[in-house]
Each structure stands twice: as structure tokens, then as C-alpha cells.
Amino acid sequence: MASFYAMTVPEFLAELGLSGRDLFDLEWRLSDGEGALIVARTGLTVEAIQAMTFQEFTPDARMMITRKDGHHCPLCPDDVHRKSLASPWVFRCPVHGADLQDATGATLPEMLGDARMAALATHAKAGSVILDAWARGAGQGILGAPEMLAVLTARHRRASPPSLAEQPRMSLQTRRDYHEFLTMPILRQALTVVVPEYDLVAPVLAKPVRPGLYGLAQGSLLQGFALTVGIGRLVEDPVALAIAVLLASDTDGQGRVQDALRSWPLSLRRRISARLWRAKRDERDRRIAQTPTRRRQSHEYRRVQSHEYRSRIS
């Protein structure tokens, strides 16, 4: 609104009689008195003013509101910050239909590839619906967004340096120069098991995400998309994916994942425990079947002596 009146934000707030008020507090919720001041100076209705705020978001979801320096539409004016683009689970501009860009100007299709992006679209849409319902306090089904994010961001394996597949091609001298980078431990999280496509394209140093809700609220465009896809997949088959994460975990990682799963409903945890036991049993049987068996050596004494063989042959 400030740009519409050709004013800076501080000038506009002073004109409204709201000088000194925090801008983000006003965008979050307006009191009746603050709304009346804006209505008196702009001529808009109270309903129109309240529709510009995030009053429908729950307090826990306030941290999800992205600021001006977040992801942006390349076709929207620089001085326009749309409310519809302020959620980290929105990846296309609803006005222009363009893919959002990150701080470097890259889009998700450029980072993931068109084919991979199309394959992930269904789960990304399902995850966006779940997150939007959670932010507005609506029903979310059996699992809530915070519970799923806790599992996705759990460290399922100990930190380890980049593997050969994660390292770029470089000469021997370059490897010596970047020895510190090649030996730097990287956090390993369940997100890479649930969304292996993210593990393939994410820069190795930028793979780790912040724990829980902070991973979505403060993550990059690619990280937010991967977490949204992960939520869409967990909603579809939570038991199978939880087992996949546990089987891919090391001993300490299994404990951390189990801690994150404690917030899940008891019925789901019982199904996970039962199927995990069967999966471990089947894996153990498969390994035993693949192990080559040695020919058993007999320890019985020979009843025929060697000299008898020689006599018979002669």
C-alpha cells in the first residue's frame, strides 16, 4: 500500500498514525483501533484491510511467513510482495504461473530437471495442501505437519564426509587444495531417504536442513520443495517410508528416528514395529541364503588303509 501512495513504509505508517509500530506485527494481525486508523485514511473497508494480514494463520505458523528477501516471481514488480507467495510451500506464482526463483535466480525445474520435476509434482501438491491446512488450523488427518517434519529432518546416520558420488570431478592437485572440503563431515538426514531426488541434485554442503519447522521456514527454495514432497509421500504411505528410514539408519540414527516417531499415533507406531521386525527377519534370511556354504569335512577314520589300496591295485 505504501508504494501505491508513492511513500516509503515509514512515511506511510506515520501518515496512518502508526509510527513506531513494527511492520511485521501489523501484517500479522491488526487490532480494531489499528484497522480503524487505516480505514479512515485509505477509504478501504475493515474486511479488505484484514484480508491483507495473516490473521488466519495459527501462532505456530507465523514463523512460516517469508519476508521480502525470500523467493520471488520474475514477472512480479520488485516493489510488490504478494501475500499468496509468502508461504514456503508455494513454488509458482498464482498470478503469472511462473516458477519462483531463489536468491541466485535459479528455478526448481532448472535445479531438478523437467522430467524429475514433473514426477514430483503430485507429492508436492499433496504436501502443500497438508501444510496449508496446518497453517490455518484445519484438520490434517492422522499425521500433522510438525510430526512429519521432525522425522524428515532427523539425523538417521552419523555425519560423514562427501562420498565419491557426491564429490565433483577434480584433479589430484585440486583434491589436495580442497582437502578440508573433502573431509568435512556432512549431516545425514532422513529427508535423503524419503526424497532421494533431493539427494541427487542438492549441493553437498547445502544438503542438511534445519530441524523441524525451521527447516521449512528458513530453508532454501530447493530444501522447502524437498520437505514439501517428503510430507506428501509420508501422508501417502507413512509406515513403509518410516521402515525404509529405519533400515537405512545406523545404530545411533535408529534411536534418533525412533525419538522423532514417538510423536506419531500409537496405531502407526505399532504397525511400524511389526513390519520392521518382519523386514529385518527377511533381510537376515536373505543374507544367510546368499552366503556360500562350505563343504563339510568328514572327521571319520578311514576303514581301509592305504597299503590295502596298493595291494589291490597290484
Give the label of every model feature segment:
Residues M1-S314:
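Basic, alpha-helical nucleic-acid-binding regions used in initiation and control of genome expression
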